[in-house]
Amino acid sequence: GRAAKQKIPVSFDEKLTNEAPQAWAGQIEQLVFKGSAYIEEVVFFHKDSQTLILTDLIENFETESFPNPLRSKVYKLVRVAAPDGQTPIDYRMTFIGHQKEAKECLERMLAWQPEKIILAHGSCFLENGRAELRRALRWIR
């Protein structure tokens, strides 16, 4: 992967699956989001705070603060600009032909009833998490 190419040492204790490891089982649910031909993102849900934690599945950048107006326009074009942040177009394209798997994963995440969504890229959604999840992943049919 990227870490190896950049000679960054990375070690793993175990592979993440749909079952939470003993260390956080009962507190945090997790799901391997399937459907992409190239990427499997593990999503997490912290039960007590009703918080969904995502890495790349949704990006939501505040483009008004970007110093370069062209960059701001590009982010809007690829649908990762707030307040309508979604799955980046390049990532979304990897789901072509596998929407059924993605839909099943989305349904499981919606069943968790998240109130908040923490994102690795951009502004988080601190309320109405379930509605924001539906909105951002509306491309999954």
Predicted regions span which residues?
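Short active-site-adjacent helix-start/loop capping segments
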Residues: 6-9, 126-127
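Short internal beta-strands
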Residues: 1-4
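Cap/insert and terminal regions of metallo-dependent hydrolase folds
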Residues: 64-141
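Catalytic core of the metallo-beta-lactamase
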Residues: 8-77, 104-105
